[in-house]
Regions:
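Basic, glycine-rich
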Residues: 30-105
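Short beta-strand-loop-alpha-helix junction that forms the active-site gateway
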Residues: 1-20, 41-45
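Conserved short loop/helix modules at catalytic or binding sites
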Residues: 19-33
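Short, well-ordered alpha-helical segments
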Residues: 16-19, 23, 56, 60
Length: 105
């Protein structure tokens, strides 16, 4: 489990660069399954409207997510991306994606 703090949701980063960076990390850890937990400490908008979230709510979800990922057992190689407190069209504090096909070489 790799936790990243993404100030400003890293909006300025190109998706290709992010995939290349993640691919390098996966290769460096020996091709083992990994979950990237990305935590946005800044303002979050749902449907364009600012959503108020306390620091305690943010940390609670981060800790819960990390604990859950540490206990997760996978029967296959996978690379997962979990975004916490990112902008979204609807209220969604946590988004999970399997990005194995995007980053595995």
């Amino acid at each position: 489990v790799i936790v990243e703090v993404d100030e400003g949701q890293h909006r300025g980063y190109a998706e290709q660069c992010e995939c290349a960076r993640i691919s390098e990390i996966v290769g460096a850890i020996g091709g083992k399954s990994v979950a990237f937990v990305r935590y946005n400490p800044d303002t979050v908008r749902y449907g364009g409207t600012v959503h108020s979230v306390t620091a305690a709510e943010r940390i609670d979800l981060l800790v819960e997510t990390v604990k859950s990922e540490l206990g997760r057992v996978s029967s296959r190689f996978e690379v997962r991306l979990i975004q916490l407190w990112y902008d979204a069209p609807m209220a969604e504090a946590k988004r999970e994606m399997d990005i194995t096909m995007l980053v595995a070489v």
